Amino acid sequence: MKKYIAIALLAGAFFTSCGEYNRVLKSTDYEYKYEAAKSYFGKGQYTKASTILEELITILKGTEDAQESLYMLAMSYYNQGDYITASHYFTSYYNTYPNG
């Protein structure tokens, strides 16, 4: 019986986290998406963070969050092992924000 309860709890946690991510993707609230991307990045969920940040970098351009979002996007790809894409975004970051 305990085994079934444990499996049910794990399944529930899995589907809840998937539901939250889908809710973020469908949202039109860009501040909410940005906060979610930062949260995913902080938790080491770089694929989720990069998916959200890809959408946000053009929207956030010219805002105070643009620099951090571009850096997190580059680091997300780097941490996923996608060094070519990471290099592209690091170069973009350097060209846009030469003083860091």
What are the residue ranges of the model-derived segments?
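C-terminal motif of bacterial Sec signal peptides marking the signal peptidase cleavage site
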Residues: F14-S17
